[in-house]
């Protein structure tokens, strides 16, 4: 008679194979994670050219998230572009980010130092928690080339944490608008962001999101209401 594995032993044997496979997969994924984190040249690489928008990405050794840089030109004025960046209404936020649902002034516009700090809350697709952004926006005009550089930096500790939401702790994004004449602006955008999603998802999706933002930029900034913005530091440097 053939030796047969008792029925009770078959599940145990399957479990051993399953457990061994899980351990091997965990080791493989851990190795891949650390290999990815250690990789990178720190050099910018062109990853997308579309309808006048150039998008570059950079992978730094020691970081799992890529950073992004984009360049384009738009028909607009410096006053409109800067006015749009100073618009802190929830309505304006929702035009830039469809999930934006609320906002709060943390520090009002500082005319002398040219900055403000504002809070925005954005809904996220289920099952992710809403995202909270506490941002300092710093405006720096350049008297030589008439450009304006705007730096957005996360300030996560400016308000107490909310249990409802994920507070974004890493954001170092910037815009630079340089007048070219004939009603054109040169636009440079930089994104360094951790939105609290898996890095492999973010790195895959980010170029498309950056492009969408640049493609929508003329519509977002070319609003009549921004023609009436009184921006004193523009008058002082132009």
Walk through the language-model features, giving the residues of each:
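Eukaryotic helix-grip
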Residues: 2-238
């Amino acid at each position: 008679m053939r030796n047969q594995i008792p029925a009770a032993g078959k599940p145990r044997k399957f479990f051993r194979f399953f457990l061994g496979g899980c351990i091997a997969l965990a080791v493989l994924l851990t190795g891949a994670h650390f290999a990815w984190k250690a990789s990178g040249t720190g050099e910018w690489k062109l990853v997308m050219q579309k309808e006048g928008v150039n998008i570059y990405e950079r992978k730094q050794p020691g970081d799992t998230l890529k950073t992004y840089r984009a360049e384009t030109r738009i028909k607009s004025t410096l006053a409109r572009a800067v006015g749009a960046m100073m618009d802190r209404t929830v309505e304006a936020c929702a035009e830039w980010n469809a999930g934006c649902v609320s906002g709060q002034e943390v520090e009002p516009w500082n005319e002398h130092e040219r900055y403000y700090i504002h809070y925005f809350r954005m809904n996220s697709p289920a099952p992710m928690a809403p995202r909270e952004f506490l941002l300092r926006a710093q405006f720096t005009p350049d008297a030589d080339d008439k450009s304006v550089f705007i730096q957005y930096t996360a300030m996560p500790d400016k308000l107490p944490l909310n249990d409802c939401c994920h507070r974004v702790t890493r954001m170092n994004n910037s815009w630079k608008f340089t007048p070219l004449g004939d009603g054109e602006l040169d636009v440079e955008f930089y994104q360094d962001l951790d939105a609290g999603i898996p890095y492999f998802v973010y790195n895959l999706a980010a170029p498309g999101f950056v492009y969408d933002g640049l493609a929508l930029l003329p519509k977002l900034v070319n609003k009549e209401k921004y023609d009436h913005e009184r921006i004193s530091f523009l008058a002082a440097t132009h």
